[in-house]
Curated annotation (Swiss-Prot):
Belongs to the urease gamma subunit family. Heterotrimer of UreA (gamma), UreB (beta) and UreC (alpha) subunits. Three heterotrimers associate to form the active enzyme. It comes from Prochlorococcus marinus (strain MIT 9312). GO terms for biological process: urea catabolic process. It holds the Pfam family Urease_gamma. GO terms for molecular function: nickel cation binding; urease activity. This is Urease subunit gamma.
Length: 100
């Protein structure tokens, strides 16, 4: 199987996000890489589901709360940017202050 660098990145995000989701379900708090992967995956899947950039930017601030991440993580994550494929092309989605 031959994958482009972008496809490899998406698979890595998926793997890390799956791990993060499982840890959340077990009641564990996410660390920095898990938090970023979880948020990034939500954007990628939302784009795949047909949501708009503005919709994802708005929803992105509700996906994780301070109680779901380790201490200090909300202060480290000021924004998350990820390129996602939408029906009308690839767009950059930026979520400001995603962990409330």
């Amino acid at each position: 199987m031959h994958l482009s660098p972008q496809e490899k990145d998406k698979l890595l995000i998926f793997s890390a996000a799956l791990l993060a989701e499982r840890r959340l379900n077990r009641g564990l708090k996410l660390n920095y890489p898990e938090s970023i992967a979880f948020l990034s995956f939500q954007v990628l899947e939302g784009a795949r589901d047909g949501k708009s950039v503005s919709q994802l930017m708005s929803e992105g601030t509700t996906w994780l709360s301070k109680s779901q991440v380790m201490e200090g993580i909300p202060e480290m994550v000021h924004e998350v940017q990820i390129e996602a494929v939408f029906p009308d092309g690839t767009k950059l989605v930026t979520i400001h202050n995603p962990i409330n």
